[in-house]
Amino acid sequence: MSRRGTAEKKTAKSDPIYRNRLVNMLVNRILKHGKKSLAYQIIYRAVKKIQQKTETNPLSVLRQAIRGVTPDITVKARRVGGSTHQVPIEIGSTQGKALAIRWLLAASRKRPGRNMAFKLSSELVDAAKGSGDAIRKKEETHRMAEANRAFAHFR
């Protein structure tokens, strides 16, 4: 670790077509084995499917879905005196967005369906409406944090 000060935070790049940082974050998380062009294809097909399903701006649906899934608080395991407690911790917006994207992709991978673009578009539309596996994961995390509120002083 450097003693001179903190390093500057890198700004997230935006994707070539929509010029959107969220789309680029999604592409980087869906990426497997360095196949970025395939990741872009999947995302753009999913965005087209969202456009066809909802007949609204697909980027606003994406934003709304990520905003709906982003957790405010999470639990972290902390060992205190021989026993492990789940300690509720508030998380920042960047980390919350990263968690939301991870949960959305995990939920869409679990879905039954033809291909990833179809599954991802379905999950994003459901999350924007307030349902789906990713929303359930967020609510479960918030319930865990609420149940372990007594351990908040261990932070």
UniProtKB/Swiss-Prot annotation:
InterPro entries: Ribosomal_uS7, Ribosomal_uS7_bac/org-type, Ribosomal_uS7_CS, Ribosomal_uS7_dom, Ribosomal_uS7_dom_sf. GO terms for molecular function: mRNA binding; rRNA binding; structural constituent of ribosome. One of its GO terms (cellular component) is ribosome. Pfam families: Ribosomal_S7. One of its GO terms (biological process) is translation. Coiled coil: none annotated. Keywords: Chloroplast, Plastid, Ribonucleoprotein, Ribosomal protein, RNA-binding, rRNA-binding. Gene3D superfamilies: Ribosomal protein S7 domain (1.10.455.10). It is found in: Plastid, Chloroplast. Belongs to the universal ribosomal protein uS7 family. One of the primary rRNA binding proteins, it binds directly to 16S rRNA where it nucleates assembly of the head domain of the 30S subunit. Part of the 30S ribosomal subunit. PANTHER family: RIBOSOMAL PROTEIN S7 (PTHR11205). This is Small ribosomal subunit protein uS7cz/uS7cy. It comes from Solanum tuberosum.
